[in-house]
Amino acid sequence: MNSYFSALPLKCVRRPFILSRNEGWGIKRFYVADEPHRSFLCMQEGVRRGGGESEITQRKADVLRKSIRSADRYKEDRSCRT
């Protein structure tokens, strides 16, 4: 976790995420403030305790984008749960 690549600053604001599927995998649910139309899953270790904001590296951001695509597919499958 010490080797950081070019940092992509994304401020993560603590808000409940619609899916609880990823609980227990060390993933917390957050909205990314820079892209309010999109909900991103921020890795737990990427979130600092003070204020609930975090800077996420480019690599982590790529992982988050893949995670939210999977979450979107799950959301479509479970469209009856809004």
Swiss-Prot record:
Top-level taxonomic group: Bacteria
Protein name: Uncharacterized protein TP_0467
Lineage: Bacteria, Pseudomonadati, Spirochaetota, Spirochaetia, Spirochaetales
